[in-house]
C-alpha cells in the first residue's frame, strides 16, 4: 500500500428513515437561534412542513434557489438573510438549494444545516459554484461545508423517477471520475466503490418500484459516499464539461451529468487502467461506458444533450471553453477527440469504447 495523507473533512451526519424529526435537536446543537430556510419554489411547502417543529425560531424563508447559483439569486438571498436578522441557514432540497446555502455560508460566515431531497451529493463537498454572465466559476473553501447534514430517505420517496435516476447518475459521476484522480488513496477508493455499488444496485429497484424505501435508503447512502469522495478528490474532464454546459448553456445539472458521463469515461478510461478495472468489477461489464449508457436508457433517463436544450452550433464553443484552462485528466485534451465526444453526447449515441 502506498503512503498517503488524508485531511478528512465531513459534516456531522444524521442518517436514516425519519431522521428529519431530529431537526430541533440538531439546530439546538448548532446554537442557531434564527435560521433562514432556503428552498426552491417547488419545495417551499415541503420545507415549511419539515421546519414546523422549530416554530417561531425560523427567521424567514427564501424560496428562490435555482440551478447553477446565479449571482442575482445570491444577492437576493443575502438581502433576505440580513432583512430577517437571521444567524444561520437551513437548506432543504437538491443541489441548487445546497449550492446557494454554501455560497451564503462562505460570504456571510454563518453555519448551515442541510437536508437533501435528491442524490446530488453537494452537501458533502467543499466545492462551490457561481454563474455570472453565462460563465460558471467554481472553487473550494472549507467554509462552505455544512455543519450538519440530515439524510432522511423518506423525504426522497416522492421524488419523481426521472429526477431520481438522473440525480443518482450524477452521484455516480462524482465517484467514477474520482477513481482516476491523482489524490486517490485506499480510504477514498473504498468510498467510491461503496457509493457506486449502492447506486448501481438501487437504480433498477427504483425503476421497478419508485416508492421502495430500502432502495431509496441505499441510493441516499450511495450519494453520501460519492459526495464525500468528491470532496477529497480532484475533478477531471467530465466535471469540467458539465460545469461548462450548465453555466454557459443553462442545461439542467443532473441530466447533463447523466448524459455526459458514459462519453467522458469512454474518453478517459483507456488511459486509466486501475480505475477501469474497478469500474468493470462494479458494473459487471468490460464495457463500462456502455453499461452506464444502458443503465440510463433502461431507466428512461435522457440520452442526448439535444433533448435537454443544446444546439449543434453550441458544440465548438463548449469544446473551446473546455480546452481553455488546464486541469488534471488521464488523457490529454485533444480538440478533435473532444469534439467527437460532444457530438456523440449531443446525438445520444452509444459511447465509443475504442
UniProtKB/Swiss-Prot annotation:
It comes from the Bacteria. InterPro entries: ADH_Fe/GldA, ADH_Fe_C, Alcohol_dehydrogenase_Fe, MAR. Keywords: Aromatic hydrocarbons catabolism, NAD, Oxidoreductase, Plasmid. One of its GO terms (molecular function) is maleylacetate reductase activity. Homodimer. Belongs to the iron-containing alcohol dehydrogenase family. This is Maleylacetate reductase 1. It comes from Cupriavidus pinatubonensis (strain JMP 134 / LMG 1197) (Cupriavidus necator (strain JMP 134)). The gene is tfdFI.
